[in-house]
Amino acid sequence: MATCAEILRSEFPEIDGQVFDYVTGVLHSGSADFESVDDLVEAVGELLQEVSGDSKDDAGIRAVCQRMYNTLRLAEPQSQGNSQVLLDAPIQLSKITENYDCGTKLPGLLKREQSSTVNAKKLEKAEARLKAKQEKRSEKDTLKTSNPLVLEEASASQAGSRKESRLESSGKNKSYDVRIENFDVSFGDRVLLAGADVNLAWGRRYGLVGRNGLGKTTLLKMLATRSLRVPAHISLLHVEQEVAEDDTPALQSVLESDSVREDLLRRERELSAHIAAGRVEGSEAAELAEIYAKLEEIEADKAPARASVILAGLGFTPKMQQQPTREFSGGWRMRLALARALFARPDLLLLDEPTNMLDVRAILWLENYLQTWPSTILVVSHDRNFLNAIAADIIHLHSQRLDGYRGDFETFIKSKQERLLNQQREYEAQQQYRQHIQVFIDRFRYNANRASQVQSKLKMLEKLPELKPVDKESEVVMKFPDGFEKFSPPILQLDEVDFYYDPKHVIFSRLSVSADLESRICVVGENGAGKSTMLKLLLGDLAPVRGIRHAHRNLKIGYFSQHHVEQLDLNVSAVELLARKFPGRPEEEYRHQLGRYGISGELAMRPVASLSGGQKSRVAFAQMTMPCPNFYILDEPTNHLDMETIEALGRALNNFRGGVILVSHDERFIRLVCRELWVCEGGGVTRVEGGFDQYRALLQEQFRREGFL
């Protein structure tokens, strides 16, 4: 029987070589995805119609596709040459093309010298349809999520294991460990990981750490979309997008995340309706009994209580649990997405900065809850205390690779320093040894009597492993300009202030607070207690209903909003952003200002939209400090910042000569900066004399009373 390639050549003798290669590639690599001739027609039919011109109609194209489909099906049992082959290592196409001088150019990227007979747009559409079909198939076995993930620029390549592939295809792979070896991850033209390995043992809790912009979030997305090969029998959930707005009550939304329970209950209702109508069959009665047994096995009757406990821990009151999801803000819907993931209990839970959406109380509850988590967790977090509480292992992303460490974050810091020290010693020792041998070679290179010894030394050098110098991460330095004159109190105060949006729901009653240029005030409290509202009253953005706001005439406030990204123009570069905000200054001044916060070189010229969350925050800091304020009001400034930048921010605030009031949920950052702790609750603000230790103890006691501990 003719092969697919022979069929194409005979039916389309004028076919362009590039199109021929593309079509045969689709046929061989996607043969397993073609369940019928319709699938094959959908994948390549439009292209073949374009190639044929007027020589074949739709029926003719379909007949050709039918022949090729039959060939593929018959070739499946014995074919070796046309099946997919797992590579021993990733292949970089750019490296391959460097070796060819024949002038071949990639389609769609370079203009061809000769004209093509194929419509490029149709070629792209065909590729997109095939890719969408493959992605849809790979996602069938994942748990239900509120929204699909979309990756437009990220890509991955991975060396395959024939043994693991055979186990997976045979259905005999029962391990819940995730082992991915020798893989690359790129974002656009940037290589984020090269030849990396990741091993996630079943039941372990992993913290993924690294500097902003290195690819932590991209790695999670690659795992979530199975662009990196995760065994199909392992269920996974990635908490990334907030729950959709609709009329579903919050509690019901959480219950629906358990697809197994929902499917059993739906089938149970159908069978019960048949029985009630007297239309039951013998097999249905047996099926109903089996469903009841499965529901009992998964403790379906206890599910509402378990979902309610999770929601309560994340701050949802009984009343809020019955509210439709459309009535919640984006932050609360993100909490709801986290609650759904915790309730569904996937085999692999992927969390990206889960503490960003939570207040201190909810973070402490989540720490306690995750410590008894039965399956595997991989969490990206820059909250040092949170990682110390929940992580049993740390994965460090740096220098385009992943290094694993046993223990919590503090253990990781010590182990990393020891590893770097040992690597540096080993490198220096080898350099000295190499130099010693090289001196001998140089001295006796032209001495005939020593020729054999020189050759021996040269072979020794060749056999030495090539050690690279230790790649040390640069220190993060931040500095807030403070070239201003000090002035005497009162600086900023609220006196007997009442505030509300609706008289039925008073937020503050008789609020009196004050701050000066020596203040380092940290504000904590549950979400919705009024923390951000109080900051806006201090800023003067909101006017008190009653009472007085007093601000010194020389006071110049710099404000950092927790929604700072919404205030940035994402379509321009960071340099252009500052130039529009503060026109008339030389470009070097904008670059210098951005460089203070780690946005330098090509980063400063890239569109802000292409920067990571932490890099966007740094741009916002550069913009905020450009006018040289003497007082800062910061609302969740550590969100999206890496740990090194958080430490640098804390040091910069401590060295700043002006005043600071900030809202934060990051325990370490609060301890680093705070001299005074305010708690927003019950329509007022309470000063906690014992600082964060006292506040944490109060929350733990509250958990015990409520039965969370």
From Swiss-Prot:
The modification N-acetylalanine is found at A2. It comes from the Eukaryota. It holds the Pfam family ABC_tran. GO terms for molecular function: ATP binding; ATP hydrolysis activity. SMART domains: AAA. The modification Phosphoserine is found at S83, S155, S157, S161, S283. Residues 178-424, 492-707 form the ABC transporter domain. Residues 129-171 are annotated as: Disordered. Residues 129-143, 161-171 have a biased composition (Basic and acidic residues). Displays an antiviral effect against flaviviruses in the presence of OAS1B. Belongs to the ABC transporter superfamily. ABCF family. EF3 subfamily. This is ATP-binding cassette sub-family F member 3. It comes from Pongo abelii (Sumatran orangutan).
